[in-house]
Amino acid sequence: MFKKYVAFVALLLAMAAAAPQAQKTAATTTAKLTSPKEQFGWDIGADYRLVNYTQYVEYLKKLDQQSDRMTVIEIGKTEEGRPELTAIITSPENHKKLAQIKEANRRLALAEVGEEQARQLARDGKSIVWIDGGLHATEVLGAQQLIETIYRLNTKSDPETMRILNDNVILCTLVNPDGMELVSNWYMREPDEKKRSTNGIPRLYQKYIGHDDNRDFYMMNMSESVNANRVMYREWYPAIMYNHHQTGPAGAVLFAPPFRDPFNYNFDPLIVLGIDMVGSAIHTRLAAEGKPGAVMRTGAPYSTWFNGGIRTTSYFHNQIGILTETIGNPTPVEIPFVLDMQLPRADVPNPIAPGIFKFRTAIEYSVTNNYAILDIASKRHEDFLFNMYKMARNAIDAGSADHWTIHPKRIEAAREAIEAQAAGASRGGDNIGPRAALGGRGGGGAPVAVYASVLHDPKMRDPRGFIVPSDQPDFPTATKFVNTLIKAGVVVHRATAAFTVAGKQYPAGSYVVKAAQPFRAHVMDMFEPQDHPDDIPYPGGAPRPPYDVTGYNIAYSMGIRFDRVLDGFDGPFEKLPDVVTAAAKVTAAPRGGAYVIDAHVNDAFVAVNRLLKAKQAVSRATAPFTVNGRSYPAGSFLIPATAESTPIVEKVAAEKGMTVDGMQNVPTGDHPPVALKAVRIGLWDQYGGSMPSGWTRWLFEQFEFPFDVVYPQTLDAGNLNAKFDVLVFVDGAIPMRDSQQGQGGGGGFGGQPAADTIPAEFRPTLGRVTVGKTVPELKKFVENGGTILTIGSSTALGYHLGLPIRNALVEVANGAERPLPREKYFVPGSILEARIDNSNPLAYGMDSTAMVFYDESPAFRLQPEAALKGVRPVAWYDGTSPLRSGWAWGQQYLDQAVSIVEAPVGKGHLVLFGNEVNWRDQPHGTFKLLFNGIYYGSASPAPAATRTTDRPQ
């Protein structure tokens, strides 16, 4: 029986929902189950064969009917509308009490019991283990191995399997159904099996974001991320989760933990130790079964720093997250001869010989890995369950008392204090050298007083909680922020009345997030800045790149105003049971009057887009003004109150939780408002899909911007002004020179196929933006009145069109400029603070400073003639230490470098966004820079900046 999943809201409902499972045990346990070969016509792992998602679902339904060990549930829909399924596999006896097992794990995970009861629940309990596959769809092993694993767990009756089924509840989930369907169909479409390939798929293998689907798990923009997180952090609470990936390091078969440093300082040490233990179980079982070629730690670049992957988010929820990266493809692959992988060492204990590696062998390796995890989860289920409780208890205790998180900046502060003491002692005649004081070899350690005065400085203690005031200008975005926390299982409260904490009064409706909760690590990681260590292998060496970004706390990047509270506090707070919408407030406009929406509010653009679509008038104020006792900044939106506009305004305000004021007269004076008009937007993309373009596509859809995707062939054909008013080029679209290739291919990687090798429907998307052919057409477009918005590397267009700018990140060597070497400058994926000229219409609604995301991004210096040509800086780095979260080696080189440039070109406008203002659709705090740019060129009369001083020239 195939059952639609129903979320259990209480134990009684859970038991009622589980009642059909008891009936299911009456099914025949000795009946033969359909094998993959009987279902599909081949064994899983056969050369040149892949199962697609439609076939997978049919097979799961059949096994669900045949087996008393498995129940299939739907956990939600994908972005393309497919059902996402989880197979719950355990013994028939456990199926009878599934609700009780689930409830016991919930109580342990949330530390809702005392230690004695927790130990009893752990002794009597069952480990819940999540195993997934297929997240990155061109990594086809992950999805296919899941089919084989499900079949074996339902059919094998050896003692180990029976013990595993008795001690564990296994959640097998295919986490990118849309991608599996696309890639498998693409591979199998080729009639000549020897020509089959997973390369060259025509679009992203997740509808919007391709490979970045594994970077979305704290933000949860995509439905697949929401589905998985709900299961793991709000419903089932697995003790271990296992995320299958490809491909293994060259010269090896697979990577499995332990991971390399650094690990994130927010999560419990039991996480790191648990990862190492489970990873060691994988390596040990592989070696025992004669499966060589597994590496660990420095054998690959993976770490546990970044929160946003499906397995890394688990660390901040007290779950042991395991990643493997394994080679294997239905088209046989070859293990290359890599000399460094042949000498055994701690991180490469069991080298493998080079040679052909079959897909079936990769399946067997994957099943071994699964069994290694399930075996240790079974044998040590009491430890895993109690440790899950213990980590939750530790988190609650840490949030309930003074606590200090030690990170590199605190160590550096202590080091400076010790060196200062040592220098003072040396001047006084005491024989205390700096090396001894710092704990060097032969020394007696550092002065203990420094531990208390610096590492435990009372001013530097962790917050007991955070308050997000409801009177901040963009409260709807603040509400989106707390909703991401709620969707990740974090407890959030809302004030039912005004209250005072630490002498400051907060209005009703403010959000409160206390640190004393089981998922405290996630709370701290989302609010507090990351402090990544200087990962430099030797003095003077180049920094070792992180696996992903280093600074990402969304309280900063979303532009949230919040307060850190260092002491315990309470107030008139109610716990929010689920995601919320901010309270809307619409003040009626008098007859002949107008509505005003604050320019700070991102969701104002939803209202603007709906109104313009309905052919209603919208304008923007060009100077600050006051209505009903409330101050509004320049750029605020003015909407004449009509029978047509009023219901649109009221509806969008209710949906988004916006405040809308009614007023009698539209402000004019010396700065009359400018009228907006609907614009025709073209968003660049190319064959295979661009992840930055996909993210932007999703963002435009959420804020209801009308747009068309435009491909290089259309751009090269010219006559662009007849089709578009605004063109948007994301990172990776416009090269600096024609030898440079943009992104493309499956998931946003790789090259493009020959036209005659792909279906005709995809051929119009082939091609690249080129300096020689495309840029001249873009020049015509902007000179004839169009607006071009460029992001990241696509700001190269500024150089192509001759703007008076130069690269800020260069040095002069032997009389010639060259990019700063990595030994001197390296800023990988961090949050920096930038100054903003918010008198410029491009920055309407922004504060005078902003947190911006920066990932080795372009930065500019303006030439002396820039001002005369109307080229203006909109954002720049004002100082030698702009880093606010992450890692910035050599950040002093950014001092006064310009991040955002606005320039007139002919009758049109060109905007250079050096930093990625919509990176992975996380930095809500800079979205409006992009949105303002879309309407900037169409405003009539054209708005202009009102401030001309205090900006870099």
What are these regions (language model features)?
Residues 135-137, 173-179, 219, 248:
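Acidic, glycine-rich active-site loops and adjacent beta-strand->loop/helix elements
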